[in-house]
């Protein structure tokens, strides 16, 4: 018995046929606010990579080097991600479900009106790769153990993936917000580890002063992301796509590049404070355990 698929709607056919990367690329270029939010970040990420590599060139301790590498990877991921957005590779046009504030919206692409809103889903890929690096650097600075690091990083990735699901779900308005709630629940786990567990570890490790500064910066900035999501085109659509993109880009600038500079500046001046074992593995200079 042959099972037939439901007919494809005319709008779906038009969307598949008309929306190309080239049109999305030109859409970005033709919106100064949107374009600046992406290209400025590409430039800042590139400059940050060069600066951070120069700053950390003299590090010798394995733990300090691991913190440095994980921190430098943040702008490395960002420059690739923002290039994907600027090129139209990681942007789509999605029709919002019934009940969504942007239901029935359309966008001009290639001189024609296309049903849907522009969704910059590539940002979620960025966060899924860059935020674990931020947490790895923070956890190592705090002198945390492998269990807490694993917990924070895995829940962080879950937060990003479920956030992506919330952005891409078009079957139900309610399901979008359900995914959003799951993402926020995962975020609460990350916040607990940052604010409670790692704060205690950092105090014992002697890095509490810098950790607390970076912790507060990270928590305040990261709390801004779900707020921008809720207010932007993916949530209640109060903010247009250009403003939404700049909201995310501003948060990225502070939560990534400024965060990384502060951490690496501290690291290069206090290498002996963070030196020692990596995770739970004793360093080569450590005293072996008794048999």
Swiss-Prot record:
Membrane topology annotation: Multi-pass membrane protein
Which Gene3D superfamilies does the entry link to? Rhodopsin 7-helix transmembrane proteins
Where, subcellularly, is it found? Cell membrane
> A Pfam family this protein belongs to?
Bac_rhodopsin
Which Gene Ontology terms describe the biological processes this protein takes part in?
A: phototransduction
Tell me yes or no: is NAD among this UniProt entry's keywords: no
Cytoplasmic topological domain: 57-62, 143-145, 196-207, 270-291
One example GO MF annotation = monoatomic ion channel activity
* Keywords assigned by UniProt, alphabetized: Cell membrane, Chromophore, Ion transport, Membrane, Photoreceptor protein, Receptor, Retinal protein, Sensory transduction, Transmembrane, Transmembrane helix, Transport
What family is it from? Belongs to the archaeal/bacterial/fungal opsin family.
Name it.
Halorhodopsin
The organism encoding this protein is Natronomonas pharaonis (Natronobacterium pharaonis)
Q: What is the lineage of its organism?
A: Archaea, Methanobacteriati, Methanobacteriota, Stenosarchaea group, Halobacteria
């Amino acid at each position: 018995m042959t099972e037939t698929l439901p007919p494809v709607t005319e709008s779906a056919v038009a969307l598949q046929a008309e929306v190309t990367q080239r049109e999305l690329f030109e859409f970005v270029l033709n919106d100064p606010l949107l374009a600046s939010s992406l290209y400025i970040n590409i430039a800042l990420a590139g400059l940050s990579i060069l600066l951070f590599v120069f700053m950390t060139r003299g590090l010798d301790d394995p733990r300090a080097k691991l913190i440095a590498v994980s921190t430098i990877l943040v702008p490395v991921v960002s420059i690739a991600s923002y290039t994907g957005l600027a090129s139209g590779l990681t942007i789509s046009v999605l029709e919002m479900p019934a009940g969504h504030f942007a239901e029935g919206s359309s966008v001009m692409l290639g001189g024609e009106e296309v049903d849907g809103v522009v969704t910059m889903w590539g940002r979620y890929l960025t966060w899924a790769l860059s935020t674990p690096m931020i947490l790895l650097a923070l956890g190592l600075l705090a002198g945390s153990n492998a269990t807490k690091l694993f917990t924070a990083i895995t829940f962080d990735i879950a937060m990003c993936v479920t956030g992506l699901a919330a952005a891409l779900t078009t079957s139900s308005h309610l399901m979008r917000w359900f995914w959003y709630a799951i993402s926020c629940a995962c975020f609460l786990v990350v916040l607990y580890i940052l604010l409670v567990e790692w704060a205690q570890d950092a105090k014992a490790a002697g890095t509490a002063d810098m950790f607390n500064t970076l912790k507060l910066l990270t928590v305040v900035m990261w709390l801004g992301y779900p707020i921008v999501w809720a207010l932007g085109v993916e949530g209640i659509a109060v903010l247009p796509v250009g403003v939404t993109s700049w909201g995310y880009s501003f948060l990225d600038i502070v939560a990534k590049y400024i965060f990384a500079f502060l951490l690496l500046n501290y690291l290069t001046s206090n290498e002996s404070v963070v030196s020692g074992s990596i995770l739970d593995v004793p360093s080569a200079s450590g005293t072996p355990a008794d048999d």
